Amino acid sequence: MAGGVDGPIGIPFPDHSSDILSGLNEQRTQGLLCDVVILVEGREFPTHRSVLAACSQYFKKLFTSGAVVDQQNVYEIDFVSAEALTALMDFAYTATLTVSTANVGDILSAARLLEIPAVSRVCTDLLERQILAADDVGDAGQPDGAGPTDQRNLLRAKEYLEFFRSNPMNSLPPTAFQWPGFSAPDDDLDATKEAVAAAVAAVAAGDCNGLDFYGPGPPADRPPTGDGEEGDSTPGLWPERDEDAPPGGLFPPPTAPPATTQNGHYGRAGASTGEEEAVALSEAAPEPGDSPGFLSGAAEGEDGDAADVDGLAASTLLQQMMSSVGRAGDSDEESRPDDKGVMDYYLKYFSGAHEGDVYPAWSQKGEKKIRAKAFQKCPICEKVIQGAGKLPRHIRTHTGEKPYECNICKVRFTRQDKLKVHMRKHTGEKPYLCQQCGAAFAHNYDLKNHMRVHTGLRPYQCDSCCKTFVRSDHLHRHLKKDGCNGVPSRRGRKPRVRGVPPDVPSGAGAPPGLPDAPRNGQEKHFKDEEDDEEEASLDGLGRLNVAGSGGDDGAGGPTVAATEGNFAT
């Protein structure tokens, strides 16, 4: 190129980074494209993982450590305050830190725990130079952060991070998960039984609580079996505890895997007390109706006591699991047909603790795929729409867009299913058929209303006159258009009698066995009912059906209401 520079040219855009950050902050405030929620003191902070990881080394380690973190959408932390996290979030997205005398101590403490050195240096400088001097800045105001409150928060922060960094799957050999329920070879059954037997012995000896997969001991140190033989150990189930160390090590292990919500979100994953552990085990235990047949087998077994699956401890489940393993290894004549399914249930129960999942529910038809229901909010009316793909259809009700057009009469519709129903008017298609009389209908609700002629069902009733109707629009017309005189109709009205002689004299009274004819205002009321409600319609076979306004129609054929002259006094 003549007179130009040969080669690539780098053109800087100084405002590009600030524009990107501004766009991300706008997405955060509107809740768009946020892939993680930080829960602090009951407040939710939707945000982006990449932004937090780029700003905080603690969040970077939290989001990138362990395989279980790939499924994590919600993190609940209790070692920082909501006000401090709000200020740090604004700093991460706007590059501006807003501090005051009241919150500088909390922000400094949170910045140290979340490893944001720039904020820590600024807050420390403000306190040392007494630019923001407070009467009582608390433990966070100490330059070295050695206050008791900071030490407790630091311990909780390390404990929370350690839970996600120590993946129990990594400490177990692959053979530990080759159970019979997961397509393991038959020759591994003996090894599996020995491993579970050692686990049961450890539980019985009190060496572990049945769910302690997070002990501080290395994988090589394993507890001895119940027979006391040295060197005989359980391969990779419960690591040995140090007798001098406190229970659970430096960071007490979680009592149960973090519970998930409907959308796959996780709750708080911290240590809990013994009472909370019992509650967690009770909630995680399978329901009696969903549990396999091992409960009935336990009632018929050696103990003879009925087992209550609610609140079962892990040791009890392990012992019942061993019983199932023993039955699976016996001959086919002695083993029960559902032992294999029982074994699958136990193995899924305990493997769920390794994988960080909730305890699987019993299902004899196999595992079911759980699909998270999509919830979307309408930007116009803020109505929450449930179901993927339904939001555009809802928005058309606001915009008036009708993309689906009938190619015959050019009528347009907002929904394709409405167009499909409309086309039946042109094609004459009537897919809904009455099984009793053979009448065909184009709409499902027409068939539903027609079936009430056979069943006598009249679900819609006037509160004033107690008159009943087959269809809701008939009741609406009775109340709004024609008006209701408020005179209660006689219960069931007069029975309809087929073949009433036409020569019954007027004023001779009703035929024998019938109640007296209506008098005074009731006669006019019944006449209005007949004028308002009775509608004749031809069914698919050309027969005439007349729906009366009161009483139950007799099943078994069309009936015609008696005329006014039959009931005249």
Swiss-Prot record:
Gene Ontology CC annotation, any one: DNA-dependent protein kinase complex
Gene3D superfamilies for the chain: Classic Zinc Finger, Potassium Channel Kv1.1, Chain A
Function: Transcription factor that represses the transcription of a wide range of genes involved in cell proliferation and differentiation. Directly and specifically binds to the consensus sequence 5'-[GA][CA]GACCCCCCCCC-3' and represses transcription both by regulating the organization of chromatin and through the direct recruitment of transcription factors to gene regulatory regions. Negatively regulates SMAD4 transcriptional activity in the TGF-beta signaling pathway through these two mechanisms.
A GO biological process held by the record: regulation of alternative mRNA splicing, via spliceosome
One Pfam family it belongs to: BTB
Residue ranges, compositional bias (Gly residues): 548-557
Subunit organization: Homodimer. Interacts with BCL6. Interacts with RELA; involved in the control by RELA of the accessibility of target gene promoters. Interacts with AR (via NR LBD domain); the interaction is direct and androgen-dependent. Interacts with NCOR1. Interacts with NCOR2. Interacts with SMAD4; the interaction is direct and stimulated by TGFB1. Interacts with HDAC1. Interacts with SP1; ZBTB7A prevents the binding to GC-rich motifs in promoters and represses the transcriptional activity of SP1. Interacts with the DNA-dependent protein kinase complex/DNA-PKc.
UniProt name for this protein: Zinc finger and BTB domain-containing protein 7A
Gene Ontology molecular function: DNA binding; DNA-binding transcription factor activity; DNA-binding transcription factor activity, RNA polymerase II-specific; DNA-binding transcription factor binding; DNA-binding transcription repressor activity, RNA polymerase II-specific; histone acetyltransferase binding; nuclear androgen receptor binding; RNA polymerase II cis-regulatory region sequence-specific DNA binding
Region (Mediates interaction with KHDRBS1): 275-569
Residue positions, PTM Phosphoserine: 331, 335, 537
Post-translational changes noted in the entry: Sumoylated. Undergoes sumoylation with SUMO1 that may regulate its transcriptional activity.
Region (Disordered): 214-306, 480-569
C2H2-type zinc finger locations on the chain: 376-398, 404-426, 432-454, 460-484
Region described as Mediates interaction with SMAD4: spans on this chain: 371-569
Location of cross-link Glycyl lysine isopeptide (Lys-Gly) (interchain with G-Cter in SUMO2): 430, 527
Protein source organism: Rattus norvegicus (Rat)
Stored PROSITE patterns: BTB, ZINC_FINGER_C2H2_1, ZINC_FINGER_C2H2_2
Localization terms from the record: Nucleus
Chain intervals for the UniProt region annotation (Mediates interaction with RELA): 343-569
Main subcellular location: nucleus
Keywords (A to Z) from UniProt: Developmental protein, Differentiation, DNA-binding, Isopeptide bond, Metal-binding, Nucleus, Phosphoprotein, Repeat, Repressor, Transcription, Transcription regulation, Ubl conjugation, Zinc, Zinc-finger
Comp. bias (Low complexity): 498-511
